[in-house]
Amino acid sequence: MSLTAVRPRRPAAAVPAPSPTPAPETPRRPRRSVVLLVFVLGMLSATSSLATDLYLPAFPQIAHDLGATESQVQLTLTAVMVGLAVGQIIVGPLSDRFGRRVPLLIGVAVFTATSFLCMVVTSAEMFTAVRLLQGLAAAVSAVVSRAVVRDVFDGDSAARLFSRLTLIVGLAPMLGPIMGGQLLLFGPWQLLFAVLGAAGVAGFALVYFGLPESLPHSERVRQDPKATLRLFGRLLRDPAFIAPTLTMGFSFAMTFTYISAFSFVSQSEFGATAQQFSIIFGINTLGMIIGNQVNAALITRMDTPRRLIAGLLGATASVAALGGLHLTGNATLVTVTAVLFVMMFFTGLISPNATTLAIVSRPTSEAGSASALLGTLQFAFGGALAAAAGLTSTGEATLGSMALVMVVTSLAATGVYLALVLRRRSVSLAAA
């Protein structure tokens, strides 16, 4: 037997035990700057928001030109909400399977085309149909924007980015009616949709050149329709998701009631012009932006659920005051505007925190579906419940009907969240 000489081994150097790696604040940062990401996503979301707000001052003019009633014109706004609701439930799973970028490009292209189609409608029915299709297209931007945030950020970082997005999106409803009112001085209401079409073209260019794919192929989920339905079922049974989602739905119904009804209320009951309405609407939206910035400042001082509860309680108190003004006969354009400003301030606390709690409760692979279900319920509640403000004897929204729907929906938002959170805590204590 031959022996092979073996070089004596050096004693192995002691390898220190790996120290636990702290969880990064942002799991994956995009190659592009955060500023560019916020701008692109904000532009997309703002364009979708302009689809609902830019033409609000033109409601009376549209009703006259199309030979429609006020409720028929309001129905065109509801059609957008229905499109947003249905579209999101479809787009969410598709974005989890095929990525974010391609569905977004298709959605923005369809949004642009329908914006130009709105310029040539000849009846309220045709207008409503095109607006429904436009809402379906706008749903893509709404879903994908939230999903991209979840792809890139987590926890407080996601909350900060949602706050920044809400700030940008908040500028759209503030500037939209003002822009719409001023544009009406230079042309008919069709000009407003030409502007929307131009914004769609700009949004397409921003996505194509400035937004890389944020969902890697390794994290994409290929599900059949049955698996998607099972996922939605799990989401609906998860208190961590459904509590903020239902809260967001009822809260949006409160806000959307104001958005859809106040154009007629301010101009019919208080004698405001289209330009005056647009300025008042912008002032009230400024309240939401201020509330959003206060929310961002409170992130390190107060946890997300408490910020959400503070917003819910404040909004409920505000709309209760609006109802009180109506019942006591003290409602004037000034007092109503002041109360609505406070209500919108607290809405700035509700939206980003409810969105954060709902989306961050799910893993990245389910972010698109979770975002879709959140958006679907949000716009379904908004479109269905806000329409109740027009269910009066004349078929027109009044201050009283608007205030009533806003009080009911704000109470529902607060009650649902508190009930589900308390139930979840009691179950956790029982399990412990």
Report each predicted region and the residues it spans.
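Helix-loop-helix hairpin linking two adjacent transmembrane segments in secondary transporters
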Residues: M126, S163-F209
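Helix-to-loop junctions at the C-terminal end of transmembrane segments
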Residues: Q88-G99, G291-P305
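Helix-breaking motifs and short loop linkers at transmembrane-helix boundaries and internal kinks
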Residues: D65-G67, G99, V120-M126, G271, ...
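Juxtamembrane intracellular "pre-TM" segments in multi-pass secondary transporters
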Residues: P22-R31, P212-T245
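Paired small-residue
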Residues: V110-L117, E125-L133, V334-V342
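Conserved MFS/SLC helix-loop-helix module at the cytosolic interface between two early adjacent transmembrane helices
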Residues: V86-A124
